[in-house]
Amino acid sequence: MFSSNQKLSSFLLSLYSLPILFLFAIAFASLKFDIPITTFTRDPAVIGNINPLAGIASHLGVLVLTASGAICIFSWAALQPTRSTKKFSLFLLGLGIFSLLLGLDDLFMLHESIYPRLFRVSENVILLIYGLLAIGGIVKYWRTILQTDYFIFGVALIFFALSLIVDAFPELIEAMIGQWRILFEDGFKLLGIIGWFGYSWRCSIQGLKKIQTL
């Protein structure tokens, strides 16, 4: 019983340590920089007095990317790495972390606002780094990817590429279709994220099925 309670206490400590530190951090930032605490805690729609549905497509994309990361990391944690599953297990972990990284970037506009100010580099440099990370992952795990439903992964990449193309030629495309350019740019991006989730889901299921064969 004592051992069980000790494990439970350790779990609760690890569960709440970071959130409590986070709350202290935003309280410190509020006092240090004279920023109202509500800026950190309230919903953006309330702070900006805007429609709660503002940015719904972007918010949905963040949720889906977060779900992608969560299921991949869960499957990685559930799949005990053995000699035969180690490669696939690490692939799931990498896919999960990269998904969460993209979700955080989308949520806080990291590559558009935060990173350029913090590291004094352009947005394009950050996008290039993301691209190199993705290419590096594909090169490292290409054999593993070929064992998965990579067609779904390919479809997701096509939609992401279409979104980038629309973003690269805004004036030309806007001259043809007006404000609907935004729908195509963000719409292709959302469809790419959905494809990314579908691929993450199938890979996670594939990883969990490997447990049954161990």
Functional labels for PLM-detected ranges:
Residues 2-20, 72, 146-154:
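Alpha-helical transmembrane segments and their helix-start/interface "positive-inside/aromatic belt" motifs
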Residues 16-39, 167:
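Alpha-helical transmembrane segments of multi-pass membrane proteins
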Residues 29-34, 107-115, 165-176:
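Juxtamembrane "helix-exit" motif on the non-cytosolic side of transmembrane helices
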Residues 45-60, 116-125, 179-191:
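Short aromatic-rich membrane-water interface segments that cap or initiate transmembrane helices
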Residues 70-74, 129-148, 200:
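Alpha-helical transmembrane segments in multipass membrane proteins, preferentially the mid-helix core
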Residues 77-89, 140-152:
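Membrane-interface helix-boundary motifs at transmembrane edges
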Residues 91-99, 147-171:
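Alpha-helical transmembrane segments of multi-pass integral membrane proteins
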Residues 93, 100-139:
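Membrane-proximal helix-loop-helix units in multi-pass membrane proteins
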